[in-house]
């Protein structure tokens, strides 16, 4: 069975975590909120592996990554929603995951993120297939709103299925109409 890692998989990406678990992956989910993790596990107890660690603590994160890979095999897919207070997380992933085989990194970004700048900063090695997902907003009946968790998960699943280099969920324009 393939192995996926989801950072941010108990909140807005919970449905994506469950989808991965129903589509051939054992899914290691990093989360700090015990209640959200329990709700996620209840949706698929066999397919979800809880990883209770604060991803900003990269020393503990690296230890957890080593342990889960030892138990569940190498990680082939990473879905990462990382806040700006975790700038060392992606370098930690790159150094902690396989150096010998290819793996995919789907990096979820906020609507205001500069994807070109982020891609330069991330600087992934050639064995890491890097994809960017940018979360936008919705325009409806002349008003705008942020995306729902369902819309986010649906868009992220489309991005994973299509392996699109840069994928926008919702819209980013007109920028002045964002909520």
Enumerate the predicted regions with their spans.
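Canonical Rossmann dinucleotide-binding motif of NAD(H)/NADP(H)-dependent dehydrogenases/reductases
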Residues: 1-28
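A short acidic, often aromatic-flanked loop/helix-cap motif at beta-alpha or helix-coil junctions
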Residues: 56-60, 113, 137-145, 174-177
């Amino acid at each position: 069975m393939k192995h996926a890692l989801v950072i941010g998989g108990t909140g807005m990406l919970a449905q994506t975590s469950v989808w991965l678990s129903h589509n051939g992956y054992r899914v290691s989910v990093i989360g700090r909120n015990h209640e959200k993790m329990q709700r996620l596990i209840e949706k698929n107890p066999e397919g979800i592996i809880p990883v209770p660690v604060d991803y900003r603590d990269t020393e503990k994160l690296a230890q957890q990554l080593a342990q889960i890979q030892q138990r569940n095999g190498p990680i082939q897919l990473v879905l990462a929603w990382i806040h700006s207070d975790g700038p060392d997380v992606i370098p930690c992933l790159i150094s902690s995951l396989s150096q010998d085989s290819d793996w995919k990194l789907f990096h979820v970004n906020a609507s205001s993120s500069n994807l070109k700048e982020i891609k330069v900063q991330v600087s992934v090695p050639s064995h890491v297939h890097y994809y960017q997902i940018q979360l936008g907003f919705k325009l409806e009946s002349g008003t705008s709103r942020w995306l729902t968790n369902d819309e986010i998960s649906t868009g992220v699943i489309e991005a994973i299925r299509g392996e699109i280099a840069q994928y926008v969920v919702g819209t980013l324009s007109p920028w002045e109409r964002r909520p």
